[in-house]
């Protein structure tokens, strides 16, 4: 390798180094500028909470363009045996009522979460929540599930297997065995088993 080759090699290296230093300097300045802009945006969003809704709408639009597919609604058509022992459907809720109730609860949760960040539901969601709440309040009060009364109701024949079945009935038995009179569990052996 001659002297001139070594000189041109060193010159090329110097130029590359200068360019590298220059570009890194530009990068540092750009990053500093970006941090300043982000700070300014955050300050604007903090001072004007309504901007959060705009950001949400922009994100939503971006997701619609090429985001993941939306969640499919849960399907409610599970097969049910129609045995004679099933409780009548009059006590239960219709599928539409269940869907409405679930949607109302979801909207209420969303409202709470947004309120934590100083944001609000969109006008359509707010209107839908009001409508669902009104429908829920106007609906006739019912309770899902079995009839009240427990395993051994006070009145009527005991439910379950003959001879006690689930547990001996302890209704009407005072807590202390020493103050107790009347029926209940035989602890002294003077009565028969209830």
From Swiss-Prot:
The modification Omega-N-methylated arginine is found at residue 13. It comes from the Viruses. InterPro entries: Delta_antigen_N (IPR027403), HDAG_dom (IPR037517), HDV_ag (IPR002506). Promotes both transcription and replication of genomic RNA. Following virus entry into host cell, provides nuclear import of HDV RNPs thanks to its nuclear localization signal. May interact with host RNA polymerase II thereby changing its template requirement from DNA to RNA. RNA pol II complex would then acts as an RNA-directed RNA polymerase, and transcribe and replicate HDV genome. Homodimer. Homooctamer. Interacts with host RNA polymerase II complex, and with host NPM1. It is found in: Virion; Host nucleus. The modification Phosphoserine is found at residues 2, 122, 176. Residues 20-194 form the HDAg domain. Residues 129-194 are annotated as: RNAPII-binding. Residues 12-59 are annotated as: Dimerization. This is Small delta antigen. Keywords: Acetylation, Host nucleus, Host-virus interaction, Methylation, Phosphoprotein, RNA-binding, Viral penetration into host nucleus, Virion, Virus entry into host cell. It holds the Pfam family HDV_ag. GO terms for molecular function: RNA binding. The modification N6-acetyllysine is found at residue 71. Belongs to the hepatitis delta antigen family. Its main location: virion. GO terms for cellular component: host cell; host cell nucleus; virion component.
């Amino acid at each position: 390798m001659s002297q001139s080759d070594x000189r041109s090699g060193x010159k090329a290296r110097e130029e590359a180094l200068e360019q590298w230093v220059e570009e890194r300097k530009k990068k540092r300045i750009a990053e500093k500028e970006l941090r300043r802009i982000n700070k300014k945006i955050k300050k604007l969003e903090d001072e004007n909470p309504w901007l959060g809704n705009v950001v949400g709408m922009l994100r939503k639009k971006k997701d619609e363009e090429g985001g993941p597919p939306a969640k499919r609604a849960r399907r409610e058509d599970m097969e049910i045996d129609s045995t004679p022992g099933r409780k009548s459907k009059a006590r239960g809720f219709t599928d539409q009522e269940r869907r409405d109730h679930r949607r109302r609860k979801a909207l209420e949760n969303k409202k709470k979460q947004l309120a934590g960040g100083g944001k609000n539901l969109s006008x359509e969601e707010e209107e839908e929540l009001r409508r669902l709440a009104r429908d829920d309040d106007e609906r006739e009060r019912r309770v899902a599930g079995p009839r009240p009364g427990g395993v051994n109701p006070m009145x009527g024949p005991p439910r379950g297997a003959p001879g006690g079945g689930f547990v001996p009935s302890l209704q009407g038995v005072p807590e202390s065995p020493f103050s107790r009179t009347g029926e209940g569990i035989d602890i002294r052996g003077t009565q028969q088993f209830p």
